[in-house]
Amino acid sequence: MIHWLEHYFDKLWPICRSITGNGVRETLRIISEIIPLNIHEVPSGTKVFDWEVPKEWNITDAYVLSPDGEKVIDFKLNNLHIVNYSIPVDIEISFDELNNHLYYIEDYPDAVPYITSYYNENWGFCLSYNQYKILPKVGKYRVVINSSLKNGSMTYGDYVLKGES
Protein backbone atom coordinates (compact mmCIF):
# COMPACT_ATOMS: atom_id res chain seq x y z
CA MET A 1 0.00 0.00 0.00
CA ILE A 2 2.74 2.48 0.96
CA HIS A 3 4.70 1.77 -2.25
CA TRP A 4 1.56 2.42 -4.32
CA LEU A 5 0.91 5.69 -2.50
CA GLU A 6 4.54 6.82 -2.84
CA HIS A 7 4.39 6.07 -6.58
CA TYR A 8 1.49 8.48 -7.06
CA PHE A 9 2.94 11.06 -4.69
CA ASP A 10 6.15 11.07 -6.73
CA LYS A 11 4.15 11.54 -9.95
CA LEU A 12 1.95 14.33 -8.58
CA TRP A 13 4.41 16.32 -6.43
CA PRO A 14 6.47 17.98 -9.19
CA ILE A 15 3.46 19.14 -11.24
CA CYS A 16 2.92 22.88 -11.10
CA ARG A 17 -0.81 23.40 -10.88
CA SER A 18 -3.11 26.23 -10.04
CA ILE A 19 -6.86 26.50 -10.62
CA THR A 20 -6.50 26.27 -14.41
CA GLY A 21 -4.03 24.98 -16.96
CA ASN A 22 -2.13 21.94 -18.10
CA GLY A 23 -0.90 21.11 -14.59
CA VAL A 24 -4.49 20.54 -13.46
CA ARG A 25 -5.20 18.40 -16.53
CA GLU A 26 -2.10 16.28 -15.94
CA THR A 27 -3.02 15.87 -12.28
CA LEU A 28 -6.54 14.72 -13.16
CA ARG A 29 -5.15 12.34 -15.79
CA ILE A 30 -2.94 10.71 -13.15
CA ILE A 31 -5.77 10.50 -10.62
CA SER A 32 -7.87 8.87 -13.37
CA GLU A 33 -5.43 5.95 -13.22
CA ILE A 34 -6.85 5.27 -9.75
CA ILE A 35 -10.54 6.16 -10.15
CA PRO A 36 -12.57 6.78 -13.32
CA LEU A 37 -13.06 10.55 -13.17
CA ASN A 38 -15.51 12.42 -15.36
CA ILE A 39 -13.54 15.40 -16.68
CA HIS A 40 -15.23 18.76 -17.31
CA GLU A 41 -14.02 22.06 -18.83
CA VAL A 42 -15.51 25.44 -17.89
CA PRO A 43 -14.50 28.33 -20.20
CA SER A 44 -12.67 31.39 -18.87
CA GLY A 45 -15.09 34.21 -18.12
CA THR A 46 -17.93 31.88 -17.08
CA LYS A 47 -19.87 33.27 -14.12
CA VAL A 48 -20.17 30.81 -11.24
CA PHE A 49 -22.39 32.38 -8.57
CA ASP A 50 -20.36 35.42 -7.37
CA TRP A 51 -17.13 34.19 -8.99
CA GLU A 52 -15.74 34.20 -12.53
CA VAL A 53 -13.49 31.51 -14.04
CA PRO A 54 -10.15 33.25 -14.65
CA LYS A 55 -7.95 33.07 -17.71
CA GLU A 56 -5.98 29.87 -18.18
CA TRP A 57 -2.40 30.00 -16.92
CA ASN A 58 0.44 27.75 -18.03
CA ILE A 59 4.15 27.93 -17.26
CA THR A 60 7.23 26.10 -18.53
CA ASP A 61 10.10 27.92 -16.81
CA ALA A 62 10.96 30.83 -14.54
CA TYR A 63 14.19 31.98 -12.98
CA VAL A 64 16.21 34.92 -11.73
CA LEU A 65 19.88 35.39 -12.61
CA SER A 66 22.02 37.44 -10.23
CA PRO A 67 24.31 40.20 -11.52
CA ASP A 68 27.12 37.61 -11.85
CA GLY A 69 24.89 35.23 -13.87
CA GLU A 70 24.13 32.74 -11.09
CA LYS A 71 20.61 31.28 -11.10
CA VAL A 72 19.48 32.39 -7.63
CA ILE A 73 15.77 31.53 -7.95
CA ASP A 74 14.72 28.56 -10.08
CA PHE A 75 11.14 27.41 -10.69
CA LYS A 76 12.44 24.03 -11.91
CA LEU A 77 14.00 23.34 -8.50
CA ASN A 78 10.83 24.27 -6.60
CA ASN A 79 7.61 25.27 -8.35
CA LEU A 80 6.60 27.28 -5.27
CA HIS A 81 9.22 29.83 -6.34
CA ILE A 82 6.83 31.41 -8.85
CA VAL A 83 3.82 33.53 -7.95
CA ASN A 84 1.01 31.52 -9.54
CA TYR A 85 -0.50 33.35 -12.50
CA SER A 86 2.66 35.38 -13.14
CA ILE A 87 2.63 37.01 -16.56
CA PRO A 88 5.48 36.41 -19.04
CA VAL A 89 8.59 38.48 -18.33
CA ASP A 90 12.10 38.73 -19.80
CA ILE A 91 13.81 41.82 -18.39
CA GLU A 92 16.95 43.14 -16.72
CA ILE A 93 16.27 45.17 -13.58
CA SER A 94 17.96 46.49 -10.45
CA PHE A 95 17.61 44.80 -7.07
CA ASP A 96 15.33 47.64 -5.92
CA GLU A 97 12.95 46.93 -8.82
CA LEU A 98 13.16 43.16 -8.30
CA ASN A 99 12.52 43.58 -4.58
CA ASN A 100 8.97 44.80 -5.35
CA HIS A 101 8.26 41.34 -6.81
CA LEU A 102 9.82 39.12 -4.11
CA TYR A 103 7.81 37.37 -1.38
CA TYR A 104 9.14 35.69 1.76
CA ILE A 105 8.20 35.24 5.42
CA GLU A 106 10.75 36.54 7.93
CA ASP A 107 9.19 34.55 10.80
CA TYR A 108 9.76 31.29 8.88
CA PRO A 109 13.23 31.83 7.40
CA ASP A 110 13.45 28.47 5.57
CA ALA A 111 9.88 28.40 4.23
CA VAL A 112 8.93 29.33 0.66
CA PRO A 113 5.45 30.93 0.66
CA TYR A 114 2.68 30.11 -1.83
CA ILE A 115 1.36 33.28 -3.48
CA THR A 116 -1.19 33.69 -6.29
CA SER A 117 -2.34 36.56 -8.48
CA TYR A 118 -5.42 35.25 -10.32
CA TYR A 119 -7.14 38.52 -11.10
CA ASN A 120 -4.28 41.02 -10.97
CA GLU A 121 -1.92 40.60 -13.92
CA ASN A 122 1.46 40.81 -12.27
CA TRP A 123 4.56 38.68 -11.71
CA GLY A 124 6.68 37.64 -8.78
CA PHE A 125 8.89 35.10 -7.10
CA CYS A 126 8.66 33.43 -3.71
CA LEU A 127 11.76 32.45 -1.78
CA SER A 128 12.85 31.72 1.75
CA TYR A 129 13.94 34.64 3.86
CA ASN A 130 17.37 33.01 4.15
CA GLN A 131 17.64 33.00 0.33
CA TYR A 132 16.50 36.61 0.21
CA LYS A 133 19.07 37.84 2.74
CA ILE A 134 22.04 36.73 0.61
CA LEU A 135 20.90 38.27 -2.69
CA PRO A 136 23.35 40.92 -3.95
CA LYS A 137 21.88 44.41 -3.60
CA VAL A 138 23.91 46.00 -6.43
CA GLY A 139 23.86 45.23 -10.15
CA LYS A 140 21.34 44.12 -12.76
CA TYR A 141 19.26 40.96 -12.41
CA ARG A 142 17.80 39.06 -15.34
CA VAL A 143 14.23 37.89 -14.75
CA VAL A 144 12.65 35.30 -17.05
CA ILE A 145 9.14 33.87 -16.79
CA ASN A 146 7.98 31.67 -19.67
CA SER A 147 4.25 31.58 -19.03
CA SER A 148 0.99 32.26 -20.81
CA LEU A 149 -2.22 33.82 -19.56
CA LYS A 150 -5.09 33.63 -22.02
CA ASN A 151 -8.69 32.61 -22.44
CA GLY A 152 -9.00 28.87 -21.99
CA SER A 153 -10.80 26.86 -19.37
CA MET A 154 -10.84 25.52 -15.85
CA THR A 155 -10.73 21.73 -15.73
CA TYR A 156 -12.24 19.65 -12.95
CA GLY A 157 -13.09 16.04 -12.37
CA ASP A 158 -15.81 14.26 -10.48
CA TYR A 159 -16.61 10.72 -9.50
CA VAL A 160 -19.85 9.39 -8.05
CA LEU A 161 -19.39 6.60 -5.53
CA LYS A 162 -22.71 4.78 -5.37
CA GLY A 163 -23.98 3.91 -1.92
CA GLU A 164 -25.90 0.83 -0.88
CA SER A 165 -29.09 2.40 0.43
What label would you give each PLM region?
Residues 1-165:
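N-terminal hydrophobic/helix-forming segments and targeting peptides
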